[in-house]
């Protein structure tokens, strides 16, 4: 899937020590210069922000993250701290947050595990173990149950074929197996859905979806909706959507985080921060195409203050 890339790029003429001094000045003494903080951090990429953190420590003798935490608050703080966190560690912290304490943020677990590639999943597993002294799979198993648990464990294994290889006979077989596992029988063989959707490569699955439609006269999404339910259904749909068009999947996540009354800030922040350097140029285009309004206008209407300012920069301007 060709993407245009992210809105946040490496700043040219970058000087970590100068940036560190600007940030210190913005936080020193009474009050905080939020605009200066946004001006530096929203216009540097993740790697550069790590260099700034190092320079801050070596030239000022303080921890930039601790200073930011004490100076900032609420959603604006969450965005800035997210931007200051290395990519894989940010995913890991979000997964942990989704399972910590009472209740589970199923949407967060699905979003991260269904959209990351096997190499990213491998690094997530490694980092999770280092951070928390136990495996991601262990925490998933103690926090979820039934088929939802099984699909998450399967995604956590990171066993998806990464090639482009296509075997027409296997495409037909998989499509037929999916049809027989759901639409054609009474009851559903959920494991069959899980094993095909979690292991095959993207090119193969796109052909399976076409063949499935030919056999059953239905989109695979329609069948998943009628054959499964709850978080298991959400997870399978997320996998299919990510295979078809990942930026459109994230556009939908953003739309749902803001539509109606109230805002799901944790989802809004996570998607804006984690996709800023990857496909944030593609997400607004898909948002506009599907919902008829710009992502920029949605964010503008749903947020305020410095929180709004920084998100609009990550969004990349009004399309």
UniProtKB/Swiss-Prot annotation:
Keywords: Acetylation, Annexin, Calcium, Calcium/phospholipid-binding, Cytoplasmic vesicle, Membrane, Phosphoprotein, Repeat. One of its GO terms (cellular component) is nucleus. The keyword Protease does not apply. One of its GO terms (molecular function) is calcium-dependent phospholipid binding. The modification N6-acetyllysine is found at residues 213, 293, 300. GO terms for biological process: epithelial cell differentiation; exocytosis; negative regulation of interleukin-8 production; Notch signaling pathway; regulation of transcription by RNA polymerase II. Disulfide bonds: none annotated. It holds the Pfam family Annexin. The keyword Phosphoprotein applies. It is a peripheral membrane protein. Gene3D superfamilies: Annexin (1.10.220.10). Annexin repeats lie at residues 14-85, 86-157, 169-241, 245-316. InterPro entries: Annexin, Annexin_repeat, Annexin_repeat_CS, Annexin_sf, ANX4. The modification Phosphoserine is found at residue 12. A pair of annexin repeats may form one binding site for calcium and phospholipid. Calcium/phospholipid-binding protein which promotes membrane fusion and is involved in exocytosis. Belongs to the annexin family. Seems to bind one calcium ion with high affinity. This is Annexin A4. It comes from Rattus norvegicus (Rat). The gene is Anxa4.
């Amino acid at each position: 899937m060709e993407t245009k890339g992210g809105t946040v790029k490496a700043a040219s003429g970058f000087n970590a020590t100068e940036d560190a001094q600007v940030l210190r000045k913005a936080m020193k003494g009474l009050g905080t210069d939020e605009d200066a903080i946004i001006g530096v951090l929203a216009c540097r990429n993740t790697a550069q922000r790590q260099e700034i953190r190092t320079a801050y420590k070596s030239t000022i003798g303080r921890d930039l993250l601790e200073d930011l935490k004490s100076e900032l608050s609420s959603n604006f703080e969450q965005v800035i701290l997210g931007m200051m966190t290395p990519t894989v560690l940010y995913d890991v912290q979000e997964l942990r947050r989704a399972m910590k304490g009472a209740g589970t943020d199923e949407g967060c677990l699905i979003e991260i595990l269904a959209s990351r590639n096997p190499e990213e999943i491998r690094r997530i597993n490694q980092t999770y173990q280092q951070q928390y002294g136990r495996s991601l799979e262990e925490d998933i198993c103690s926090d979820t149950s039934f088929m939802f648990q099984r699909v998450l464990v399967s995604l956590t294994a990171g066993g998806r074929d990464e090639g482009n290889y296509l075997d027409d006979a296997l495409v037909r077989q998989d499509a037929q197996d999916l049809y027989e596992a759901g639409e054609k029988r009474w009851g559903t063989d959920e494991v069959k859905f899980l094993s095909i959707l979690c292991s095959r490569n993207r090119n193969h699955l796109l052909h399976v979806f076409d063949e499935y439609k030919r056999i059953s006269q239905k989109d695979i999404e329609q069948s998943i909706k009628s054959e499964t339910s709850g978080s298991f259904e959400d997870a399978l749909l997320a996998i299919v959507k990510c295979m078809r068009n990942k930026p459109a999947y994230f556009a939908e996540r953003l739309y749902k985080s803001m539509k109606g009354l109230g805002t799901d800030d944790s989802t809004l922040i996570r998607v804006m921060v984690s996709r800023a350097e990857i496909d944030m140029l593609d997400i607004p285009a898909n948002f506009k195409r599907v919902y008829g309004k710009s992502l920029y206008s949605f964010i503008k209407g749903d947020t305020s203050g410095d929180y709004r300012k920084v998100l609009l920069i990550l969004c990349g301007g009004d399309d």
